[in-house]
Amino acid sequence: MRHISFKDSFFTVLLIVIASLAYNKRSTSAFIDYNEPGSYKVQALSIPTEIEFAGETIQLKEADLIERMDKELLVNTYWQSNTILMLKRAHKYFPQIEKILAEEGVPEDFKYLALIESGLENVTSSAGAKGFWQIMRTTGREYGLEVNANVDERYNIDLSTRVACKYLIKAKEKFGSWTLAAASYNRGMSGIKRLLEKQQSETYYDLL
């Protein structure tokens, strides 16, 4: 089995989602010739050389990352049922999330984090994380959410988004980077701290 590094996993998925939605927001005229009834073009997509996330420029130079990006862009462009569902949910919920991110001072790109975590659905993970932002019970209570047998505010989009913002701001203050803040949302602040110390790294991109 090929070794999968931390850097190959969560944040790579985040980049792929950002790039995929950017491509799919383009006009469908790139794939349909309206002058020729019934026409539909299937074509390879060019891979961007860099992506900007939360004001930080990310260079796409690693061969493995480029190959995975290429695969996911093609899948999400031509697997239209899945893409349409993602875009419909994004159209419905992103404005609500964007407003709160702006009020809390968190970059708008973090709306994609909720999409990755839950597909913008109130789901429950095998570990017990719940809601759009997949918040654990202890974390929710730590950040002021009411979580008990009768009420679970992790399912409240507004309240859970504000909790996610508080967490991300705290992580940004701790690590000095929105990229590391995003990575810590999945791995935990202590987990990222241990990785940075163990590998004597200062940035997300130096992690193996």
Residue ranges and their predicted role:
Residues 62-208:
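Catalytic glycan-binding domains that act on GlcNAc-containing polysaccharides
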Residues 1-105:
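An acidic, Gly/Ser/Thr/Pro-rich helix-cap/linker signature
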